[in-house]
């Protein structure tokens, strides 16, 4: 049976992650209160940030920036938006 949690990002009960996605305290916090659905949303956001900002993930400063953005996305006022991103329009 799937592990259900109250998702901090989506504000609803949803299926939780199978394991902590990151090491340390932030990974534990995400595991305990972020759903699979919300995590998938973050992976898309993270990819846009890496691409738009041309982040080199071998650079410790880039990794530190992404960790801060991860925490802001789930538990703060939202992560930075990719500067060149224009949401698709319906129609």
Swiss-Prot record:
Pfam families per the record?
Iron_traffic (PF04362)
Homology family: Belongs to the Fe(2+)-trafficking protein family.
Per UniProt, the keywords (alphabetical) are: Iron
Task: Name the species this protein comes from.
Answer: Burkholderia cenocepacia (strain HI2424)
Organism ancestry: Bacteria, Pseudomonadati, Pseudomonadota, Betaproteobacteria, Burkholderiales
Q: Name one GO biological process term.
A: cellular response to oxidative stress
- This chain belongs to the protein called Probable Fe(2+)-trafficking protein
Family matches, as Gene3D superfamilies = Fe(II) trafficking protein YggX
Task: Please explain the role this protein plays, according to its UniProt record.
Answer: Could be a mediator in iron transactions between iron acquisition and iron-requiring processes, such as synthesis and/or repair of Fe-S clusters in biosynthetic enzymes.
Q: Which GO terms describe its cellular component?
A: cytosol
InterPro entries documented for this protein: Fe_traffick_prot_YggX (IPR007457), Fe_traffick_prot_YggX_sf (IPR036766)
Question: What terms describe the molecular function in GO for this protein?
Answer: iron ion binding
Q: Which PANTHER family match?
A: FE(2+)-TRAFFICKING PROTEIN-RELATED
